[in-house]
Amino acid sequence: MPATIKDIAKKVGVNPSTVSRVINGTASISEETRQKIKDAMKELDYHPNSLARSLVNGSTFTIGLVIDAGNSDAFSNAFFIRSVSAIEAVTQQRGFNLLITSDSDKEDNSAVKNLILEKKIDGIILPVSAATEELIDLLLGNHFPFIVLGEPDKVRDGIHWIDMDNKQGAEDAVNYLHRMGYEKTILLVENRITMFERKRIQGFQAAVGLNGKDVAENLIVECGVESNQIGEAIQRALNKYPDIDSIICTNNVVAYETLKFLKKKNIAIPGSIGIITFDNYPLAEYMDPPLTVVDIDTYKLGEEAANTLFSIIQNLGQHRKEVLLSTRIIERESTMKGEKRKK
């Protein structure tokens, strides 16, 4: 015979109403008691009736996460997977389910719209690439809880968003290289379209200026993502500035191709040119040489996004939240040229 709420309450030594409140998330219960109840539920193989919970609470106990269908690498991207893992962990801790959908029909976002209009979810997390004007209007017009993963191009009342502090990350990279004694740095960017790339450009420009260097536009090199494009872009920069001694790459693909190109040209790393890249992707520490990185904690990004969404669900009228999470430099051999020349 299946276990009941009374069985759970008896095992833990609390009232059935306390068990019910933990299951439904309707009251503040101490973490110790909450954990005991969850452990008992697991031990007795108790599964709450989701339909009954929904009827009692007026909640679906489900959070939506939209995936950028236009990004073919989304599910193979380690950073994306870590963010999703964090979001899922938070939703489970809250007793919710996570529903993942895509914006494959970008013309009208019909799948996402249906989730919102038919109240199939209690809140939604959107990547900035999916946060179209039309979809934002729909969410705001229906007073629907949502948060955008990434800084949007336009700031509007009611839009909550969370992102890494890409501008500060780029500033930190330039300042780190300056402390290490590097004098001439270029920034390799895949494009100037996305907000995070533009923020990294802004940070680079700000830090180069503060360090008393000439902030020439051609120190910012747009390189694309293909191997031959990146190699050609680096060669053009070296032809123009033979004294380049360091490169900041704005993502790991660019960094990998930069390593390949410099090795092919027999340019010593870090002996002649130091390299630092955004994103501490899994293989960065195993490259030859291991790459110094601007670490982007995407697990924390997903965790904060989910927790902020639950906060919004509980208090829909709260002031707009704009959250920037800090990056950090992880130093490895790609920027350590002999002895550290400056402390």
Regions found by a protein language model. Name each.
Residues K184, V215-L219, I269-I275:
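Short acidic capping loops at alpha-helix termini that bridge into adjacent secondary structure
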Residues A69-I81, I100-E107, I162-D172, L188-A233, ...:
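Hinge/beta->alpha junction and helix N-cap segments in small-molecule ligand-binding domains
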